[in-house]
């Protein structure tokens, strides 16, 4: 499925840490016939979701013991943990994850600039989906967004679909931040590739718009069904960002950040041979993984989990 969207390598994302052992088992048994699993990303469980239309959901009890269980359950596959650093007890957990060689990101946070910078000083080195579920830039306190942009040691993720961040905000990010410290992401949900319509997912009713955005029945943005290539098209066509810069932010920078640049991120002799061929309208024509053709649009069409879509469609 993901190969049909031009994806050759992934960190599957879990929100509930109880899923780590299941994903680790899949990763261990997975033979890459499409997107290759390189690690696991845990977005939570310690998040401060006040940014989502004023909803404060709280967070589970935080402890180093819980963090140790997450690492154990992941069987070495856990590479990235996203956390709200202002949560009491977060610094001890951050220190533990870093001691295990796991990258820590700031995510779903309600902190101000000073608090955000304190989190980065503790070793956080990634800002999760910059601008989304974090404190905004204000002329008296530039908040979580400003902290991510101004801290040169921090790599910022960007959702570049034009809705999670408006294009003008994306321009600000790219004017302020060194492009070597920006990573394009999709924020895709399991509904990635699903047709326009109404579904029951994540324990609620959701709607996929014609633009590919996932909305709750109250209109709250709940992620995207559009892949990274959609964001690349937006940046090139609407903001006139050179394609080479987009590819650096989408491919090379993540490979460097997470330690895979020796084999991933560029097309060079000795690397894996992960190649995506597109047409002039950014449709995926062919995807190669380690030099092997794993997707052919003419032969395969658009691939997604049809039984899953049928089960959740309303």
Q: Where is each model-derived feature located?
A:
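Active-site glycine- and acidic-residue-rich loops that bind
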Residues: 16-23, 86-88, 105-109, 159-171, ...
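His/Asp/Glu-enriched, well-ordered alpha-helical/loop segment
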Residues: 143-156, 175-186, 191-277
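Conserved, mostly hydrophobic/aromatic
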Residues: 2, 42, 97, 127, ...
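C-terminal cap of metal-dependent C-N hydrolases
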Residues: 256, 266-314
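Glycine-enriched alpha-helix->loop->beta-strand junction motifs that scaffold or abut catalytic
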Residues: 74-77, 93-104, 120-126, 150-155, ...
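Divalent metal-dependent hydrolysis catalytic cores, especially in the metallo-beta-lactamase
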Residues: 1-21, 35-48, 75-86, 102-105, ...
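Active-site-adjacent beta->alpha loops and helix N-cap segments on the catalytic face
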Residues: 19-21, 83-98, 113-117, 137-145
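Active-site gating loops and adjacent loop-to-helix segments of metal-dependent hydrolytic enzymes
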Residues: 1-9, 48-75, 117-134, 141-155, ...
């Amino acid at each position: 499925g993901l190969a049909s969207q031009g994806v050759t390598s992934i960190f599957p994302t879990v929100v509930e840490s109880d899923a780590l052992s299941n994903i680790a088992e899949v990763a261990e048994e997975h033979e890459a016939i499409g997107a290759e699993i390189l690690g696991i990303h845990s977005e939570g469980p310690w998040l401060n979701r006040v940014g989502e239309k004023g909803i404060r959901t709280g967070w589970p009890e935080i402890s180093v013991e819980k963090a140790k269980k997450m690492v154990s359950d992941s069987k070495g596959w856990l590479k990235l943990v996203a956390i709200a650093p202002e949560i009491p007890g977060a610094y001890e957990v951050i220190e533990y994850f870093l001691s295990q060689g796991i990258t820590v990101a700031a995510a779903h946070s309600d902190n101000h600039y000073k608090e955000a910078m304190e989190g980065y000083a503790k070793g956080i080195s990634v800002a999760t989906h910059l601008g989304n579920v974090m404190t905004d830039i204000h002329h008296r306190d530039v908040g979580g967004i400003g902290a991510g942009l101004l801290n040169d040691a921090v790599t910022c993720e960007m959702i570049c679909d034009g809705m999670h961040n408006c294009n003008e905000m994306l321009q600000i990010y790219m004017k302020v931040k060194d492009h070597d410290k920006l990573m394009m992401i999709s924020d895709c949900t399991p509904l990635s590739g699903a047709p326009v319509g109404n579904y029951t997912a994540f324990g609620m009713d959701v709607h996929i718009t014609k633009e590919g955005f996932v909305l709750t029945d109250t209109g709250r943005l709940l992620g995207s069904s559009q892949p990274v290539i959609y964001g690349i098209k937006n940046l090139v066509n609407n903001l006139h960002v050179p394609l080479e810069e987009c590819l650096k932010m989408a491919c090379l920078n993540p490979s460097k950040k997470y330690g895979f640049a020796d084999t991933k991120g560029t097309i060079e002799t000795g690397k894996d041979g992960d190649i995506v061929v597109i047409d002039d309208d950014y449709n995926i024509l062919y995807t190669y993984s380690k030099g092997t053709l794993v997707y052919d649009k003419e032969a395969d069409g658009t691939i997604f989990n049809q039984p899953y879509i049928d089960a959740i469609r309303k």
